[in-house]
């Protein structure tokens, strides 16, 4: 089967959508399919030609973004007035135009028109939404008399207009509906997100296809030893939907020794200021790591006594790190700001994991997930 994957991020980036695109491409190539990855971001100094040979896939680069691995574009402005003006400008730009959505999606469509050969299945990964809009524009330009031979699948983790993180102008609702009309299916990771998509696309076109990983070649540490409670968090923090400050405030009240390892993808100035404040108070009890490669991360997580998951305050997203947590086979305490229970946390600190979260990882096996996509063709 001839398969194309359109994605903004790919290996070696440490991002859930990069993991998804990479695992799908690698597994489909392993199964003998002809795989082409259309990639919007180029990491400086990375050898994509060598990666193509290793995976037996084709990588077609679209030069929309070029950056260093782990780098994040952060605007630094010390003047409070200019900082407020910049924030207002960015907010208006995002609310009314969604940044460079229209310009970049048009460029994506043009690149696809020039480079896309006949495919049996095309999977476009959202985040950013311009992937979906770009492919929809490409499909819309196809001649009306073209025989339908390709199955187009939009893969999304969070709706664009109905996002609980970002407010946008009303017309984006109709743009999103127009986009989904050009896809045969919309795949989302969890059924909890269906109500958010129901106003945008017929229910029968929505398919539940979760995040996926290769679980066959995972190296885990032996059972953890040592008397000092050691626990970890991996992923990202946000100021709004996943703010960790309440947890750090509790940790500062504990008299006993512990080690809390925090694994983050990149440095965010707002989150860094929070971490720095509490690292001064907690000292060696708080250990912060950045940009740790996934296989190394899994091993490090498996060395801990237990793991913690700070849940989103949104209902449409399922953190992909929960799959990684399940792979490590370590107990997981999951909570948010409102459900955090100091007594349960204390029980975990003393080896009582009766309230551990149950994570069934079989549905997230890459072999299962790749078949779910193939079955749609």
Sequence positions of predicted segments:
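A charged, aromatic-enriched C-terminal amphipathic alpha-helix characteristic of glycosyltransferases
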Residues: 350-377
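Nucleotide-activated donor-binding/catalytic signature segment of Leloir-type glycosyltransferases, i.e.
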Residues: 264, 272-296
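A conserved catalytic-core segment of Leloir-type glycosyltransferases
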Residues: 43-103
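Conserved catalytic-core segment of nucleotide-activated headgroup transferases in glycan assembly
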Residues: 215-216, 226-275
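Carbohydrate-associated surface elements
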Residues: 192, 211-212
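Acidic donor-binding loop of glycosyltransferase active sites
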Residues: 300-316
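Nucleotide-sugar donor phosphate/pyrophosphate-binding loop at the beta->alpha transition
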Residues: 146, 151-153, 160-178, 215
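Membrane-proximal helix-turn-helix segments that form the acceptor-binding/catalytic region
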Residues: 23, 103-106, 130, 169-188
